Regions:
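Flexible, solvent-exposed loop/hinge segments and secondary-structure transition points
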Residues: 30-31, 61, 116, 124-145, ...
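Small/polar-residue-rich segments within soluble enzyme cores
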Residues: 2-105, 408-409
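A helicase ATPase "motif cassette" and its flanking acidic/Ser/Thr-rich regulatory loops
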Residues: 120, 234, 429
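Conserved, well-ordered alpha-helix/loop/beta-strand core segments that scaffold catalytic motifs
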Residues: 10-11, 93-136
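Short, small/polar residue-rich loop motifs at catalytic or cofactor-binding pockets
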Residues: 79, 132-135, 206
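Beta-lactam-recognizing serine transpeptidase/beta-lactamase-like catalytic domain environment
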Residues: 86-99, 112, 138, 142-183, ...
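Short, charged, low-complexity patches
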Residues: 64, 68, 113, 117, ...
C-alpha cells in the first residue's frame, strides 16, 4: 500500500534505523526490490544527565529539542549538488559538473562541565526522591563568564531511548517554568534599598509586633517578633516584615527598575528554545499590598535561570553578564547593575544567612565560605494560595572571597514532611 500510494517516488522506506542483523535477515529473504541503505544515528553519551540541554533530533537528524533544535542550522551543514548523466535504470554513469559544494556541519562546544552536571543531576534526583517532590531544577553558572556549567531537571529523559519518550519530560523546566521565588528575592530588595542611599547594612528596622498591617489588615508576619533589627538580620532571619517595610519605603518606579536591572521580568537571552521572561508587573499597577508582598517573593515570577543570573550579579561585584549555553572564548562585556559597595555588602549579609543564625545553614560546605538565601513559597491554585503545596528554593554562590560558581536549586511540591527552602533546597547546594 505504501508503494502504490507513492508511485512518483523512486523508493519508499519500509523501516529505518534497523539493527544491522535485522537488515541482513531481510535481505536473505530474497524478496525482489528490497535493498538496504546505511544511515547514521545520533548517540548521546551523557544520556538523561544532559538530555534537557543537548536535546535530540528526529529520524532525519533534524533538531527537535534543546541545543539540537536551537543550533540545527549550525550542526547540519549543507548538502551539495552536481549535474550528472544517468542510464535508463537511473544509475549515475557520469558526473558533468559541480553545481553547489557540500558544507559539513560545524562543531558546537556546549558550556557544560560534565563533572558538575553529573553531580547536580545526582543530588537533584536524590532530593526529589527523598522529599517525594513533584519536580525540580538546578542551575550552576560560571560567575566570570556567564556560562551555564550545569542545568538539570527532574523528571528527565534519555534521548537515546526513543521507545520510552514521554513528551511531558521534554520541557527544560529551568528556562520554561516560572514560579514565585519567596524569600529568595529578598537580597534584591535589600540591594535596591542600599542603592537608594537611604539605608546601610547597619540601618535599624523595627519589625514589632512581628506582623505588618497594610490597608487595615495583616498581610504578613514573621515566625516571631524580632523587634528592632538591622538590615543584615532581615536577610539572616528572613524577616518578611523587615523586607516589606524596606520595599514600601522605596519609590515604586525605582524598585521596579532595580529588580528589572537584575533581570527579573526579562529574558536572559540564553537563546534556549521556549525560555520564559517571567513576570514583573508595571509599577503603575502596583498597590501598597502588592508592593509589600513583592519583598518576600509574591506577585512576581522568575525562572531558575533568571534567578541564577540575578545572584551572579551579586557574586560578580555588581555586574551582569549574559548567560551562555555555549562555551565562550573570553568573558563577555558586563553591565553594571549595582555598586561594588552594595554587592560586597550583600555578600556579607548572605554569608550571615547561611551561618548558624541564618535560615540557610544547611547549605554550608566544609572548608569553603558560602553565601546564599533560602525561599519558601505557597503555590497558587484555584481560589488562591494552597496551604499544603510549597516551592522550596535556595540561591547562592561560593567561595565568598572570590566567587566562582553560582547555583540555584528549586524543589517543586516536596511532600515528604519538610518543605522549607532551608531544609529541602539548601542541602542540595
Amino acid at each position: 500500500r505504501r508503494i502504490t500510494s507513492n508511485p512518483e517516488k523512486e523508493f519508499v522506506y519500509l523501516r529505518r534505523h534497523m539493527q544491522p542483523e535485522h537488515a541482513a535477515r531481510a535481505l536473505q529473504a530474497g524478496i525482489p526490490g528490497i535493498a538496504t541503505q546505511r544511515e547514521y544515528r545520533r548517540y548521546y553519551p551523557a544520556g538523561e544527565v544532559a538530555g534537557h540541554i543537548v536535546g535530540f533530533t528526529n529520524i532525519d537528524d533534524v533538531g527537535q529539542e534543546g541545543l539540537e533544535y536551537e543550533f540545527d542550522y549550525w550542526l547540519r551543514g549543507e548538502t551539495g549538488a552536481k549535474r550528472v548523466i544517468r542510464d535508463r535504470l537511473g544509475r549515475v554513469i557520469e558526473d558533468v559538473e559541480l553545481v553547489a559544494p557540500s558544507r559539513p556541519g560545524k562543531i558546537l562546544r556546549a558550556s557544560l562541565d560534565l563533572r558538575i552536571q553529573y553531580l547536580a543531576y545526582r543530588e537533584l534526583k536524590k532530593a526529589i526522591t527523598d522529599n517525594q517532590a513533584l519536580s525540580g531544577s538546578v542551575v550552576v553558572l560560571d560567575v566570570e563568564t556567564g556560562e551555564v556549567l550545569a542545568m538539570v531537571n527532574q523528571p528527565s529523559y534519555n534521548p537515546n531511548d526513543r521507545a520510552q519518550f514521554d513528551a511531558s519530560r521534554y520541557r527544560n523546566r529551568a528556562v520554561t517554568d516560572i514560579f514565585e521565588p519567596g524569600s529568595s528575592i529578598k537580597p534584591f530588595i535589600v540591594a535596591a534599598a542600599l542603592e537608594s542611599g537611604r539605608y546601610e547594612a547597619s540601618s535599624i528596622i523595627d519589625t514589632s509586633p512581628g506582623h505588618l498591617r497594610v490597608g487595615g489588615r495583616v498581610i504578613t508576619q514573621d515566625s516571631r517578633n524580632l523587634g528592632e533589627i538591622d538590615v543584615t538580620t532581615i536577610l539572616a532571619k528572613s524577616s518578611n516584615v523587615g523586607a516589606a517595610k524596606l520595599a514600601l519605603d522605596l519609590d515604586q518606579e525605582f524598585l521596579w527598575s532595580s529588580l528589572s536591572k537584575f533581570g527579573i521580568g526579562r529574558l536572559t537571552d540564553s537563546g534556549f528554545p521556549g525560555e520564559s521572561a517571567g513576570v514583573l508587573n508595571d509599577p503603575q499597577n502596583w498597590r501598597p499590598v502588592g508592593q509589600a508582598t513583592l519583598a518576600y517573593g509574591y506577585g512576581l515570577s522568575v525562572t531558575s535561570l533568571q534567578l541564577a543570573q540575578a545572584y551572579a550579579v551579586l557574586a560578580a561585584d555588581g555586574v551582569r553578564r549574559p548567560v551562555s549555553m555555549i562555551m565562550v572564548d573570553e568573558p563577555p562585556s558586563a553591565e553594571r547593575i549595582v555598586s561594588v559597595k552594595t554587592a560586597r555588602a550583600l555578600k556579607n549579609m548572605l554569608e550571615a544567612a547561611v551561618s548558624p543564625i541564618g535560615t540557610g545553614q544547611r547549605a554550608t560546605i566544609n572548608h569553603f565560605r558560602v553565601a546564599g538565601k533560602t525561599g519558601t513559597a505557597w503555590k497558587a491554585g484555584v481560589g488562591g494560595y494552597s496551604k499544603d503545596r510549597y516551592l522550596a528554593v535556595f540561591g547562592g554562590f561560593a567561595p565568598v572571597a572570590n566567587p566562582k560558581l553560582v547555583a540555584v536549586v528549586v524543589i517543586n511540591e516536596p511532600r515528604g514532611g519538610a518543605y522549607y527552602g532551608g531544609d529541602v533546597a539548601a542541602p542540595v547546594f
